[in-house]
Amino acid sequence: MPAPRGILCRPRDIFTEQTVARLARTATITDLDAESDDGTGTVIATPIIRWLESQEAAGNPVDYFNQTVVVQAPSGTSEADVLVMLQALLDRHAMLRARVEEDAAGRWTLTVPEPGTVTAADCLHTIDVLTDDAVIQAGVRLNPAAGQMVSALWVKSTGRLVAIVHHLAIDGVSWRILLEDLNLAWAQHRAGQPVTLPQPGTSFQRWATLLAEHAHDPKVVAQTDTWRQIAATPAALSPASPETDTLNTAGNLAVNLDVETTQMLLGEVPAAFHTGINDILLIAFGLALAEFLGTGAERICIDVEGHGRDEELGADVDLSRTVGWFTAKYPVAMQAAGLTWSQVVSGDPALGAAIKTAKEQLRTLPDGLSYGMLRYLNDNVDLDAADPPIAFNYLGRQGAATADGSGDVWQICWDGLATVSPGVKPPIPLTHTLALNAGTVDTDTGPALCAIWTWAPSVLNHAQVSRLSQLWFDALTGICTHVRGGGGGLTPSDIVAGLSQEQIDELQRQYADS
C-alpha cells in the first residue's frame, strides 16, 4: 500500500504477519524527500511486451490489442464529470500515457510523458446509443505509436462509460485499481474538492528495469535448462491457422459452474490440499485434457498466464496500486497419473494421490516470471520454442459487490457489451488453438466459476469444446467430492522435514487412528 506518512507496509505483509507487533517489525521507513518514482521517461520493454512485439514482427496487427470494460456511472453523471474522472486517471497512472517507439531493428521501447500531456477530451467520444460501429471506431482510434493508449465512449442514454485501453497499458488487476480510483475521485469531485489520487508505490518503469536486471542474475540463468525441457514437450493440438483462425472467426463458449461447487473450490478444496485455487483449477484442466485427448499419462504442455506481480524482486517493491501489463506467460507440462475417468468423477482416493503428485510437479517449477525474462530479456539465452497451443488463465474474483448501497458509485458491468455483436472483434490471428480464461463472478446466489473458452475453428468445433468444458467441470466436482469425503493432506513441499509422500501419508494415517 502507498506510504503517505513515510511508512511502507505491503498488503501481503498484513496477511503474513497477522499481528500489529509482527507487522511493525516488517514495515519500513521511506524517504519522503527522495525523488518521486512517478514512472515518467523511458520504459524498458518487459517480457510480455517483447512477446507482443514478436507478434507484430510475425505480421500480426497489434494496434487493436486491447481490454474493454463497461462501467456504470452514478445517477446524474454528466459528460463534464466523466472528463474530470478520466483526466484524473490519465494524470495519476503513467502507463495510460505511454507511447511506443520502434528502432530500426523493430525493437520497442516505451516513453511516458509528464501528467497533463494526454487530455481526456482527446480520449473521450460521446454517443447517444452504444452500437457495433461506435465500438469498432473507438478501437480503431487506439494508436500506441502516437501515445493513444485510451479510447473511451460516454453513452448518454445509459450513463455508461466504455473504456477501451490498449493491453500494453492494462491488465486484469489494473482494472480493479482504476475502479477504486474512480470512486475515490468521484467522492472528492462530488464534495467540491480537487481530485487528488494516491500515488502508486512502485512504477511500471522501475518494475521493467528490475526485470531487465534480474534476467542476468545467475540464479535465474540457471533455470534455463528446466524451461527448455518443458518447452520441448510436443504440442497436444495442431496450431491455429493465422489466415482463417482470427478473433472475429473464433469459436466462443461461456459456461458457469454451480455456486455450491464454486464455494468449495474457493475455500475447502485449496485448504485441504494446502495450495491455491489456481493450482486446483490447472490440475483439473490437465485431467480433463488427458481424457479429452486420450493421451493417458503423456505430458500435456499448457501456456499458463499469471498476474506476474511478484513483489519479491525487490525489498521495497509495492505494486498494489500500479497500473500496467504485468502478465507473466510460461509453459507448464502437466502429466496425468493414469487415472480412469470414473475415478476422477467419483472422487476416488486415487484422485487425491494424483492431485498431490501434480501439485508437487507444479511446486518444482521455477518462478514463471523467469521464463519470460530469460526468453525475451537475456540475449545470451536461447529459448525459442513455439508457445503451447493450449492456454490457461485464471483471472481471480471479478465483480465483487460494492459495500456502498447508495448507488452513488461507479461499478463495472460484466455484461456491458452483451448487446454488441462478436463481429466488432478485429481479424487478429489467434495466438492459441484453445484458450480457457476463467474467473469467479458474483451472482445473486453467490460466487460462480465462469469458464470462457475460445478456439480455432480449423482445429476444433463447438461440440468438442462443449465436451471438454463439461469434463473440466466434472473433474472439479470430483475433486470436491473427494474433499467432502475427507480427502486432502500435506505433500513434501509443505514441510521441512524432508519426508517422502509415502512417509507423510503413513504419519497422517497413524495420527488419524490415534
Language model region names:
Residues 1-18:
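Phosphopantetheinylated carrier protein domains
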Residues 38-41, 58-66, 83, 94-95, ...:
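His-Asp-centered acyl/peptidyl-transfer active-site segments
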Residues 48-74, 103-130, 134-137, 146-151, ...:
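Acyl/amide activation-and-transfer machinery of modular secondary-metabolite enzymes
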Residues 3, 150-205, 464-481:
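Active-site-proximal acidic secondary-structure segment that organizes catalysis
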Residues 1-2, 23, 82, 281:
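Short, compositionally simple motifs enriched in small residues
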